[in-house]
């Protein structure tokens, strides 16, 4: 059963809730539900260490999503590659295809191409560099 804080923290009730190590996945019937979803950050923060992703099938894309992470220091992430490594296998199985197009419906929004392999997920898309540096190991 999903935690009450999750259900109360989402303005629209999901049809299904799944969970992995990173987040609760609130699955909706339509992209419109995901796009119009409001959240209560204070309630979602109590779900730490888990964040929350809302997702649904879409007419324009294979699936859409939004990613909320108040427990980690922000309300909603613009485009989140890591969460798509969990979403893509779910939608690939459901839609019976391995190459998917996704849209993260944040205020800035972003398109992600997902290629689901046997044990890997490859993501491609456009990014904006915000930092440049060198790491020495």
Can you say where each PLM-predicted feature lies in the sequence?
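Active-site proximal loop and beta-alpha junction motif in alpha/beta enzyme cores
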Residues: 1-137
């Amino acid at each position: 059963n999903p935690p009450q804080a999750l259900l109360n923290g989402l303005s629209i009730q999901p049809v299904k809730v799944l969970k992995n190590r990173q987040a609760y996945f609130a699955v909706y019937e339509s992209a419109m539900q995901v796009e119009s979803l409001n959240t209560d950050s204070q309630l979602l923060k109590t779900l730490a260490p888990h964040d929350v992703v809302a997702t649904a099938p879409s007419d324009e894309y294979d699936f859409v999503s939004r990613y909320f992470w108040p427990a980690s220091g922000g309300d909603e992430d613009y485009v989140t590659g890591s969460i798509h490594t969990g979403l893509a296998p779910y939608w690939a199985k459901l839609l019976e295809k391995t190459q998917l197009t996704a849209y993260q419906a944040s205020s800035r929004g972003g398109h992600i191409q997902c290629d689901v392999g046997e044990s890997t997920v490859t993501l491609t898309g456009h990014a904006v560099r915000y930092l440049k540096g060198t790491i020495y190991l």
